[in-house]
Amino acid sequence: MAQAVREVVNNEAAAEDDVWIPSACAVCFNQCSIKVHRKNGVVVKIEGNPESSVGMGRICAKGMSGITMLYDPNRLTTPLKRTNPKKDFNEDPGWVEITWDEALDTITEKMKKIQADDPRKLMGTATTAGNSSFSFWFTNLFMSGFGSPNAFHSNGHQCGNAEHVLAGAMHGATTTMPDLEFCEYMVVFGSGIGGHAYYAFTSNAQKMADARIRGMKLVVIDPVLNGVAEKADEWVPIRPGTDGAMAMAMLNVILNELGQYDAEYLKAHTNIPYLIGPDGYYVRDPDGGKPVMWDLADQRAKHYDDPSLSDPALEGTYTAHGKECRPGFVLLKEQASAWTPEKASEITSVPADTIRRIATEFATAARIGSTIVLEGTELPHRPVSVVYFKGAHAHNHAWLTCFGFETLCEVVGACDVPGGVLGTNPVCEGHPDTGMPRWAPWAGPDGLLSPGVWNGQSEPGLRTGTPYPPRDPVPPETLTLLDLLSTGFNPGHLPVLAMQDMEGFKIPYKPEMLFVIGPNIVYSLGNPEVTANFLKQMFVVASKLWLDETTYFADIVLPDACYLERLDPIPNTIPHHHPAGRGNFSYAIRQPVVKPPGQARYIIPVMLELADRVG
């Protein structure tokens, strides 16, 4: 296939050229499948590809505008070298054109010196969004192969940190999505699902429309009447940053006023029956150290995986192993009881009656105890979802706020069941012939779920891997400071901040070189002046389609290929481009449509060449 594609591209300037080439978009991380119309060697139109399950034939306005990226008059066509040693926004870098050999020789020399001294002094950053999306995954592998832990995400500190960590800890997945095929009541906090932005945006927009036609009620909690809210059954304006208060008030109504919860689910699939002692910690079996529950069947404490455990208590006070204790569910109800709708109303500006009504509708729509038969298997049916994303966790205490949303679904049993919130995708059974790739959640400490694959890690117990079990903080040896963060997920802005206080963080080396693969980190990582100071301290190699604010601080700029000019075997990950639930899960190969201009080259083959040169 690749050879056939190259022949088509190589013959692009042929007379009477008029072809449609299937490929994959890269204007955002969704990577929708597209068809590209090339006529007489020129791309004239981009459409969605109806033959692919990735995007379901849809394409957004940004995707259609990819032609402007391809033919931008500011595209770089040759490597550039800085001649002005002063780096600042007001300084002309004094760019001069150089050959690829000179560029790669210079970079190789720097890398060999770092490799001999301390590989950790090399850093790399890329993004899952936009033209460099596939390069993000490769950059992580490249840095790991070189021996450096300092690969970081350039999307900034608000890119999914709370949602991804909750998805990993609660679903064994990287992300969560609603099961739109069977959901009947959806509450949206700060998300653009179906309206203007989200995972698998174009596919989920269609699925949202189908669900609305089917009768799903949509309630949007958002300060702004956005593209989702304008299509909702109900838009509830809320004071920015107060979503967590409303979630807790809804939880209070469901647990303490209505008394509606899925006891069977909570007992079988959560740690909420674990007994909690006066110190706030699990009561543990002194023999094996395992947390215990109270079995109502024979009125005694048993560890969580005791095969004789049959009816864990959710409420009550007990004495176990010499300690007076209560199930975690009791503490959850007590914690929620402090958040009355009236109190939450003062904080959120949402009327108390509205909070109480939405909570009641949500609990009722959950149909606790109902089942559905799918493909011959009877499964729990909980057709309610709470959807949240960047708008909800772009504030302080985002992890706790999102935990509140997640708990709403947990208490009614609407997690990883038809109609509820699904992890994407916690289990992969692998290719039937080879068994690869293959992953599934595993039982972590204390019996709690830990993802089989998450954020690029696939082996249980890897220190920088999954969000659960949490890591013990240790003095940092990486610029990401993940050593200090128990459940952190690649916070992109922290290397910039850590570089300002290397002595304070006691990091035992100072980075000397940085690869910037695509993103404009001067803007994406926060304070431009702080990021500029970060860039001034290193030799910077930037792979770019055009010059931007970040290249003011680059030493060498390499002209990259646009997504319509390159071959990518796996454009992005399934959590980004496939809806959750049933469906045809697949990857769509990105195929080149035209050649790169001038001497522009796709950065991944360039980095592979650098790897060969460095050895």
Predicted regions and their residues:
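Extended redox/cofactor-interaction regions of prokaryotic respiratory oxidoreductases
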Residues: W137-M216, I221, A245, S310-G316, ...
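Glycine-rich phosphate/diphosphate-binding loops that line cofactor/substrate pockets in enzymes
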Residues: R82-N84, A103-M123, T176-M186, E334-A336, ...
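Short beta-alpha connecting loops at secondary-structure transitions
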Residues: E230-I238, A561-I574, S586-P596
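Long, C-terminal catalytic modules of enzymes
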Residues: R582-G615
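N-terminal export/assembly segments and adjacent metallocofactor-ligating motifs
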Residues: M1-E264, A268-A313, E324-C325, P445-Q457, ...
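Active-site rim elements
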Residues: S345, K390-N396, P592-A600
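Acidic/polar loop patches that form or flank catalytic/metal-binding clefts of enzymes
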Residues: A151, G259-Y265, D353-R356, S385, ...
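A glycine-rich phosphate-binding loop feature that marks nucleotide/adenosyl-phosphate handling sites
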Residues: A129, A268-P273, E361-F362, E378-L379, ...
